[in-house]
Amino acid sequence: MKVIDQFKNKKVLVLGLAKSGESAARLLDKLGAIVTVNDGKPFEDNPAAQSLLEEGIKVITGGHPLELLDEEFALMVKNPGIPYNNPMIEKALAKRIPVLTEVELAYLISEAPIIGITGSNGKTTTTTMIGEVLTAAGQHGLLSGNIGYPASQVAQIASDKDTLVMELSSFQLMGVQEFHPEIAVITNLMPTHIDYHGSFSEYVAAKWNIQNKMTAADFLVLNFNQDLAKDLTSKTEATVVPFSTLEKVDGAYLEDGQLYFRGEVVMAANEIGVPGSHNVENALATIAVAKLRDVDNQTIKETLSAFGGVKHRLQFVDDIKGVKFYNDSKSTNILATQKALSGFDNSKVVLIAGGLDRGNEFDELVPDITGLKKMVILGQSAERVKRAADKAGVAYVEATDIADATRKAYELATQGDVVLLSPANASWDMYANFEVRGDLFIDTVAELKE
């Protein structure tokens, strides 16, 4: 471990639980810190807080009392979902209490090298692809971070023979100071989470934190399909390795249906195990990382050919009487849904869309939804999505929730069609997260098959 005594006997406040906060609290306690956990959920409805209390960790629940910070804390570790304009965080910063996220703790204790993956779309798929390729090559890629496995929890069990393959959100990267991956990937940068960050430039700045401590000995893998990525190359000390589906670059690229790395064919694009142009980009990013880690082409090809995707990201669910169901609940913005649709024939797609309206420009979807067989629209953003459907000339019906939407979509579909849940919106108007929304879609498909 990089630190042994750094936290010993230090008073640390963990703000917000969920998976990452719970993991951070246990790790800090293990490292000898004097831990206090503060979570807004009432104690009686808070199994994580109950469990931590049983382990001897102090917990304060049901709100975030500012007077708690009258104690002399040496450090605050915050849940990444809590914004920096939260009064507790503002007071901590005013008192010059360092505020970190759990990812920083993972870096500080990790004996394993770290590959960090961030971006607006494609993070989970690319992270999973990289992890599977490295593991197939004997390099033990351990998935962690925003992908569902708390980074600090995985870091505790990782050795120097493993590699931490870490999916990182902009929320997590806002709280890093010393974090230093040996390879970082930025899949793409699109306007999203503006309600959290305030502006696109602030969002990009948060993502860009991934490379702050990198040097010329480290590698930064960037998507040269985007001019923004090209512009950012002059602002890093890291060695930039580009990937692109649009041009030949000094890295990974697509040419005549083949995926190359620096002039050498690795595999054919149509051999990738999951559909869609976006997955070609994800595969190219993966190839760049794999080649930087000296993985042979055959291992890369075999792994990516067998790759079955990830849950909630263009996940094939089932086939009922010739109608195929795909769960793309993780598509919480316009670009993700555009890329999902690119893998299908619109005339055979019944699209389920809508959810929490976070200021998306739904007119951008009009060219992509033109020609759809039908749409099923739901959620807070329904009126704006319906206006986009009208402009595209697509007929639609409305639904009250995901179960209702799934049933109506199936009624509208015929043999050979696809029912695609790709909402282009966050889930929080109806559901706790996109996973809950996707699981309800899967459950309803199972009921339809009975």
UniProtKB/Swiss-Prot annotation:
**Functional pathway:** Cell wall biogenesis; peptidoglycan biosynthesis
Q: Name one GO biological process term.
A: peptidoglycan biosynthetic process
User: Does the UniProt entry include the keyword Kinase?
Assistant: no
Molecular function terms, GO-annotated: ATP binding; UDP-N-acetylmuramoylalanine-D-glutamate ligase activity
Q: Could you tell me the EC number(s) of this protein?
A: 6.3.2.9
Known catalytic reactions: UDP-N-acetyl-alpha-D-muramoyl-L-alanine + D-glutamate + ATP = UDP-N-acetyl-alpha-D-muramoyl-L-alanyl-D-glutamate + ADP + phosphate + H(+)
Looking up InterPro entries in the UniProt record yields:
Mur-like_cat_sf, Mur_ligase_C, Mur_ligase_C_dom_sf, Mur_ligase_cen, MurD
Instruction: Name one cellular component (GO) term.
Output: cytoplasm
Q: Which UniProt keywords apply?
A: ATP-binding, Cell cycle, Cell division, Cell shape, Cell wall biogenesis/degradation, Cytoplasm, Ligase, Nucleotide-binding, Peptidoglycan synthesis
Q: Name one Pfam family in it.
A: Mur_ligase_M
Positions binding ATP in this chain are 119-125
- Main localization is cytoplasm
Compartment annotation: Cytoplasm
Q: Does the keyword NAD apply?
A: no
Similarity-based family: Belongs to the MurCDEF family.
The job of this chain, per UniProt, is described as: Cell wall formation. Catalyzes the addition of glutamate to the nucleotide precursor UDP-N-acetylmuramoyl-L-alanine (UMA).
State what protein this is by name. UDP-N-acetylmuramoylalanine--D-glutamate ligase
> Native species of this protein?
Streptococcus pneumoniae serotype 2 (strain D39 / NCTC 7466)
Tell me the lineage of the source organism: Bacteria, Bacillati, Bacillota, Bacilli, Lactobacillales
Q: What gene is this protein a product of?
A: murD
